[in-house]
Amino acid sequence: MNAELSAETREHLEALERGFAERAACDIGDGGPDRGAHVDFDVVLAGGGLSLVYAAYLARRGLRVAVFDRRKIGCGHREWNISRGELRPLIDSELFTEAEVDALVQLEYDHGICRWHGGGTYPVRQVLDCVVDAERLLDGLRARAEAAGATLIDHHALAGYRVGAGGVEVRLSPAKTLSPAKTLSPAKALSARVLVDGMGAASPHAAFDLVCPTVGGVLTNLLDVDPRVGEILVTTEDVEDDRQHIWEGFPGPDGRFTTYLFYYTEPAQLPPRPLHALYERFFATRPRYKRGEATLVKPTYGFIPAYSRLRPMPAARDRVLLVGDAAGRHSPLTFCGFGSMIRSFLPVADALRARLDEDRLDARSLAKVWREPPGLAVMGGLTLMMVPGRRRSTDPRDVNKLLDAAFASLGELGDDVYGAFVRDQIGFSDFIRFMRATAKRRPSIYDEVFSVLSPSEIARWSWKLGGLALKKWSSG
C-alpha cells in the first residue's frame, strides 16, 4: 500500500481516522452570546466540501457567512455521479447557468447495472448516469462564495462551541498535521446566529448508527471497462471477515475509471485503522473486479455515515442545523449522499433563511427545516439486514443471495421503481410490490426481518411504513 499511496494521502487517511474516532470529544456547552449581543456572522458553516453549496447560496442572498474546514475549502476527496435531472437545483438556485451545469457533466452512460456474486446482472436507466466534474463543481462553489463575500477559513477544525440566547460562539483550532514542516495558524473564535454542521462522519452531532468505510480512486489502464455502463453496485465474493465487500465503478473521460470498495457495518464493529485496512484489501482484490496493470491517478476515500431511523435520534441543540451526511439525509441502503444533498439544499437553505428572518433558531424550529421522507426509514430496515454481524445465518453466500433476490425484483418492476429505490424516493405502493416480488424469490425474507431487527426497531419500521402509506393516501 505504501507504494500506491503518497505521504500526503496517508497523512489525510490518518487525520480522517483520528477525526472519526475523536468526533465525540468536541467541547460543547452553554454560555454563548447573550440576547442582543453582537455576532460576527449570520451563519458559520462547519465543513467545506459539498456543503459549500449552502455558503455560496446564502451569501448570495445577503447573509453574513463564514466557512471553515480542516483541509482547504473546496478540496474534495470523492468523485460523484448523478442523473441529469437531479442537477436542476444548481440552476434553480441561480448558482450556475444551464450551460455551466452542462459543462460539469463529463460523461453520460447508456445505463447502469447492479451485479451480485453467484447471481445476476440487473440494468437500470437514468440512475447515476452522469459523471460530474467534482473539482470543477467545488472550485465553482468556492469562487461563488468568495465573490458573494463569504469568509473562508482553511485548515481549521471545530474545537467546540457555546450556545447562548443570542447566538453561538464557535472555537476553531488549527487542523492537526503529521508534517512538522507545515506551519500551524493560530486558533480562532467566531460568533454567529446559527452553526450549520456539514462535517459528515467527523461531525460531533452526526445522526448515524451505521457507517460505510469507503476507499478507491481514479484509475487508468484497466481492462473489462465498458464506457457506456456505470457499475452502481457489484460484488465479486461472499462474506469474509464478517463483512460483505461491495464495489462500485464508473467510467470517466480519457480512459479513466473511478472505483470504490466499501462495506456496511455498525461503528462499534470497525477494525483499527479501517481506511488503511480497506485500502490494503482494495489493492489486493481489485483484479477480481477489474483486470489490468492499473495506475492510481487520484485516491478517493472517506467514511459515509448513515442513519437507519430505527433507533432514537441524538438530542438536537438550539442554533445548530445538520446538513448533508452529518444529517443522514440519504438512504442508508444506497448511500447516494451527493444526489441527496443537491436535491435538498435549496428547500433547506430557503427554510433556514425563513427561520433567521423570524429569529426562530431553537432546536424544535430547526428540526422542521427538513421533513424526512418516510421511505428513508423503510430503507434503513433493509440496510440492517445487509450487516452480516446482525444476521443469524453463518452462510457466507447469504447477503449476496438476499441482494440478488431484491434486485431481480427491482429489474422486473422496471426502471421507474428501480430508479426511485436507488434515489431514496420509492413510494408505498411500489415498496409493497417490491417486497412481494422479493418474497416470491426469497420466501424467508419476512422471517429475516424479524430475526435481524429488534422489537423496538420493528415497531419503528412499521410506524415509518405506515407513514409512507399515509403519504400515499393523503395525496390521492
Where are these regions (language model features)?
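FAD/FMN-dependent oxidoreductases across multiple families
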Residues: 131, 267-380
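C-terminal helical "tail/cap" subdomain of flavin- and related membrane-associated enzymes
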Residues: 10, 14-21, 350-476
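Glycine-rich FAD pyrophosphate-binding loop
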Residues: 48, 57-79
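Predominantly flavin-linked oxidoreductase catalytic cores and closely associated redox partners
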Residues: 148-287, 345
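Short, well-ordered coil/turn residues at beta-beta hairpins
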Residues: 47, 196-199, 323
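Extreme N-terminal leader/targeting segments of oxidoreductases
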Residues: 1-42
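Short beta-strand to alpha-helix junction loop
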Residues: 122-143, 214-217, 268-274
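N-terminal FAD cofactor-binding segment of flavoenzymes
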Residues: 75-113
